[in-house]
Amino acid sequence: MTSLVYAAKGIRILGIDPGLRITGFGIVEKIGNRLVYIGSGCVVTGESGLPDRLKTILDGLNEIILQHKPEQVAVEQVFVNINPKSTLLLGQARGAAISAAVLHELSVYEYTALQVKQAVVGNGHARKEQVQEMVMRLLGLGERPRPDAADALACAICHAHGGTGLLTLSARNRSKRSKRL
């Protein structure tokens, strides 16, 4: 008699914490009610001009998507800063990050920093160190990830815990709309 063994199929989630200088990324896989750490890091843009920085973000995330093959993407939303110029620049970095996901026809989910912190720490006003500590514990990491990578992992964890996000850009819906045109 032959027994069949089925591998548990998880959902691979790429979390992104967009930034013009440093864009954090983190990949987790949700298998049942478990979260498995896949990888994390940062795309560093340097001091070049805005178009070059945006291209670095797009290219860096494109490479990460090709390498890790996520099925869904969770992105932290921009908070309105005191400085409107900074808010607009950060929005452009987010646009580059979302574009990388959309180019691969991935579903994109957005979460506020408050939602992410609430989901991961239990306190929407948690400090960065608290987020890093909880990410380390939840994923069984040996050390705290860099702040930007920790925020990206926290965003992925928030999504994995069932957050629906404020805005969903579904690849399926986009393809349906394009067929109607």
Curated annotation (Swiss-Prot):
Q: For binding Mg(2+) 2, which residues are annotated in this chain's numbering?
A: E76
The family assignment reads: Belongs to the RuvC family.
Give the protein name, as stated in the record.
Crossover junction endodeoxyribonuclease RuvC
What EC number(s) does this enzyme carry?
3.1.21.10
Gene Ontology annotations of biological process type: DNA recombination; DNA repair
Query: Could you tell me what the cofactor note in this record states?
Result: Binds 2 Mg(2+) ion per subunit.
- What keywords were assigned to this record? Cytoplasm, DNA damage, DNA recombination, DNA repair, DNA-binding, Endonuclease, Hydrolase, Magnesium, Metal-binding, Nuclease
- Main subcellular localisation: cytoplasm
Give the quaternary structure: Homodimer which binds Holliday junction (HJ) DNA. The HJ becomes 2-fold symmetrical on binding to RuvC with unstacked arms; it has a different conformation from HJ DNA in complex with RuvA. In the full resolvosome a probable DNA-RuvA(4)-RuvB(12)-RuvC(2) complex forms which resolves the HJ.
Cofactor(s) this protein requires? Mg(2+)
Matching Gene3D superfamilies? Ribonuclease H-like superfamily/Ribonuclease H
Q: Which GO terms describe its cellular component?
A: cytoplasm; Holliday junction resolvase complex
- What Pfam families does the record point to? RuvC (PF02075)
Function as written in the Swiss-Prot or TrEMBL entry: The RuvA-RuvB-RuvC complex processes Holliday junction (HJ) DNA during genetic recombination and DNA repair. Endonuclease that resolves HJ intermediates. Cleaves cruciform DNA by making single-stranded nicks across the HJ at symmetrical positions within the homologous arms, yielding a 5'-phosphate and a 3'-hydroxyl group; requires a central core of homology in the junction. The consensus cleavage sequence is 5'-(A/T)TT(C/G)-3'. Cleavage occurs on the 3'-side of the TT dinucleotide at the point of strand exchange.
Q: Name one GO molecular function term.
A: DNA binding
Fetch the InterPro entries from UniProt. Answer: RNaseH-like_sf (IPR012337), RNaseH_sf (IPR036397), X-over_junc_endoDNase_Mg_BS (IPR020563), X-over_junc_endoDNase_RuvC (IPR002176)
- The active site is formed by D17, E76, D148
Membrane-traversing stretches: none
Instruction: Output the PANTHER family linked to this UniProt entry.
Output: CROSSOVER JUNCTION ENDODEOXYRIBONUCLEASE RUVC (PTHR30194:SF3)
Q: Quote the catalytic activity from the record.
A: Endonucleolytic cleavage at a junction such as a reciprocal single-stranded crossover between two homologous DNA duplexes (Holliday junction)
Q: Has UniProt tagged this entry with the keyword Magnesium?
A: yes
Q: Which residues bind Mg(2+) 1?
A: D17, D148
Q: Where in the cell is it found?
A: Cytoplasm
